[in-house]
């Protein structure tokens, strides 16, 4: 992953995820998406307790190449070396993550152009999670 021209090995602690762009360097076709850095998992409660035990697990963000079927197919055919992965925005919460992903997809008109792998835009955001200016 790259961010502003620099390689990314670790995610800053204050961010929950990022909005990214994957580019096919042979055709120029792109994909806009989002990725969470950690997932919440739960274990069954301990004996005699009712509440589940929750813990966090790091996601597969280091190896991730998007969820589009067409993109995955091209990556298998052309190889990962023909794709660049760039982080566009760091996000502090899930609402901001979903909002910025959808905002970028609408602004770039990803559904109206064959230049993008994106096949649909799915978003559900509550305004309370956004930092309003």
PLM regions: where:
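Structure-specific nucleic-acid interaction/processing domains
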Residues: 1-133
């Amino acid at each position: 992953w790259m961010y502003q021209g620099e390689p990314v090995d670790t995610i800053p602690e204050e961010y929950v995820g990022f909005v990214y762009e994957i580019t096919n360097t042979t055709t120029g076709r792109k994909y806009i998406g989002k990725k969470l850095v950690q997932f919440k998992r739960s274990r069954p409660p301990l004996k005699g307790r009712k509440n589940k035990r929750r813990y966090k697990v790091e996601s597969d963000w280091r190896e991730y190449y998007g969820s589009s079927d067409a993109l995955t197919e091209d990556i298998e055919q052309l190889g990962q070396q023909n794709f660049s992965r760039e982080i566009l925005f760091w996000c502090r919460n899930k609402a901001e993550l979903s909002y910025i992903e959808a905002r970028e997809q609408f602004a770039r008109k990803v559904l109206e152009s064959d230049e993008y792998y994106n096949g649909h835009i799915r978003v559900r955001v509550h305004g309370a999670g956004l930092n309003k200016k």
